[in-house]
Amino acid sequence: MKRREFVKTIGAYGIAGLLPSLTVPYRLLPSLLIPMDDAQSDHLKAYGVAYRAIQAGLKAEWLLNYRGGSFLIPDADALRRDAALNGVRTEPVDEGAVTTIRGEIEASNMDAVPLEKAPKVAVYAPPNAAPWYDAVTMALQYAGISFTKIWDPQVIGGALREYDWLHLHHEDFTGQYSKFFLIYSGMPWLADMVQSNSQMARQLGFQTVPDLKKAVARGIRSYVDNGGFLFAMCTATETIDLALAAHNVDIAATFADGTPIDPDADAKLDWSQAFAFTGGHLEPNPLIASFSDIDGHQVNAGSRRQPLGAFKLFNFSAKIDPVPTMLVQNHRQVIPDFYGLTTSFLRNRLKPGATVLAEEEGAPWVKYIHSDLGKGTWTFFGGHDPEDPQHQIGDPPTDLSLHPHSPGYRLILNNVLFPAAKKRELKT
């Protein structure tokens, strides 16, 4: 197939209609570079263009550490149109320019990683989730990356196996309604949360919401153990580990399950079941919207609350450690911090195998961590919304068209594309 016929085929059928029988060697085709440095006009939508290219069966490459983590895709009319309609800057590059780029990559701390398969994405969220509930949902919608919302019935029913990538956000897997029950009593959104969770627990055969959430946490752990990719932010990071560690312990306040917390709960927690954390101490006060001492910032804990600073992304060896390198691709290395119910993770609460991707220099906490579990991987990112640092309940959802270059949201979208990369054994 000649290039003219290749372009005509894509233009006639659209990106998604491109036939998988295309046999022209990828590297012989003219290419489009999607720069991800300061030349890019919309960093976030650029991820969507790359995602849709591989979703159509086209070969793409992620150029790690090259101009902010750029993408290389085939030069086709449909891809040019997609980029133009979304305000994404592309640069046509001929074979000579590509050869020059590859030479620079080979000689530097860079790498070219093939992106082979668009991951099937699931977002765990209750049906009544508010617009300010989930920064990842907003990022996916803005970038134009397709996803499916799932909740407890799908997890308990085993549907997670249908998805490559799962996101968790503002979910309290201890079943205590984010410990808002007493603080926000009487608020309609809280009443809806309690009613929907209680009804779902009964429907699925659990006596209490905490029992249901523990089972959901175990289902998610099994999903990762069997090869799934998990990305969690905010409350979900801390509470899923608490729920896993408390599989045989009552850690929920009386308002959540009708019984008090086990007074010896701290000593009975089984951290071997957790993803990231160990040795945490619970916050037993039902009036304090904090779960444990895992979170370094304690945003709702009065005198324990810590001010926001900035976190710095680590530099990794792209050729030796491609996975953490992918997760930190950015056009900024230092990023302003942002609160969440869980904002950060105390370093002395991390399991030894956790890789720190970003930290606040000189602070006892870290921001962004990653590791493997079984055949899969997990990544935890503290905080709620990178462009809403204070994040108050009831705030309007962030308008990402006002933040097209958000470095914090780029970290979210790195995680979406990471499962698309051709698997390669980590060398360290």
Report the location of each language-model feature.
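Catalytic beta-strand/loop cores that center a nucleophilic Ser/Cys/Thr
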Residues: 134, 141, 238, 249, ...
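Structural recognition of the beta-strand scaffold that forms the well-ordered cores
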Residues: 123, 167-168, 230-232, 378-382
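Alpha-helical scaffolding within the catalytic cores
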Residues: 105-109, 153-155, 364-367
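Extracellular/periplasmic catalytic domains that process cell-envelope and extracellular macromolecules
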Residues: 114-117, 158-161, 223, 372-374
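Helical hinge/lid and interdomain linker segments adjacent to catalytic or ligand-binding clefts
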Residues: 32, 37, 41, 71-81, ...
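N-terminal export signals
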Residues: 5-25
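Extracellular ligand-binding/catalytic regions of CAZymes and related secreted enzymes
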Residues: 29-35, 41-72, 250, 349-355, ...
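Hydrophobic targeting/anchoring helices
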Residues: 26-134, 143, 383
